[in-house]
Amino acid sequence: YLELVKYIFQSKYRKGFGVHSPSVFRLVTLVIEEDLPYYKFSLVEKVRSLTKNKLRGILRDNEDESLRQLTQSPIQKCLYTYDYEQLLFRLVNYYKPDAILEIGLATGFSTMYLAAPNSKATVTTISDSALLEEFSNSNFKSAGIENVEFAIGDIYSQFCTLMKTMS
């Protein structure tokens, strides 16, 4: 998926020129190349800025070294990047799905961007860390996002369970 986005940004079909399919043209021009901010972006970014120090404190005070090593790198990355998260927001806003499944949870900001466009859509996120779920849930509450459900435990078994209930 990431390579497709890189290709679109670097290809000669920039801004939709040369794309023959109307649906792909609309996707490129209205979603991928769109650079206008949505009102929800500022809400999520405000929560992000308020939680940077709080998150660092949780990682510093946590006794579990394996959790710290596992989450420190992705969390540091999530604190400062938002371009792909805003693309996720635009994709959800464009396609308007009823249910979204996210596998893996770092800080929950990408989950907020998935849940923000449509408060009626259910976003289910699978994570193996109750600590990150607790942290993310507090961020969701401060952002006013209530359409997120968590499945905590072994990611593979949680995924299998969710797929059985969805079908």
Protein language model features and the residues they cover:
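A short alpha-helical cap/connector motif
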Residues: Y1-S167
